[in-house]
Amino acid sequence: MMPSDHAAAKTADEGERMTQAREADTPLHDTPVEVRNASGGGPFLLVCEHASNFIPPEYGMLGLDDAALESHIAWDPGALAVADEMARLLDAPLVAARVSRLVYDCNRPPESPSAMPAESEIYRIPGNAGLTAGQRQARTQAVYHPFRAALTTAIDAHGARRGPPAIVTVHSFTPVWR
C-alpha cells in the first residue's frame, strides 16, 4: 500500500468511527487533545488542530445534521491520517485536537469570535449562536486550555531532548469553499 492509499484508508476509518460515535450518542474521546509518538526523536513537532469532527454529547451536535458534521466546516478531513503518517515517517511527536473546531477552534485564541463561530461557510451553527461569556469561558477551559497545555508540554519535552522543534501544522482544504 502506498502512503497516500494508507492515509485515505485511515481517513475513511476515522469518518466512520466519528459517525458511529454520534449515532451511538457516546463520547468517542474522553480528552480534547491527544499526543502521539510523544518521545519522537526527529527535529519536527506536528500539530493537527482540526483532526476531529467529534462533538461531545453535551453540545447536542450544535444543532447540525450529519452532513454538516462530515463536511469541512467541522474538521479537516484526512488531516489526521496525513499527520499520523508524517509522524511515523519523521519520528515526530504529534499533538492533535480530538474535538471539532466548531466546539472550539484550537487554532484561534479565546478572544477571537471565530474560536466558536456562529456561522461557517454556508452553515449557521445554532449551538454557537448567542453564547454567553460564561459559556465561551467554559469551552475555553474544556478544550483550548488542555490543548495549549499539551502543546506547550510537547514543545518543552522536545526542547529538552534535542532543542527547539520545527513546528509543522497539518490541515486539509476543500476543493470548493462555499
Model-derived segments and their meaning:
Residues 2-6, 13-167, 172-178:
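N-terminal catalytic or cofactor-binding beta/alpha core of small enzyme domains
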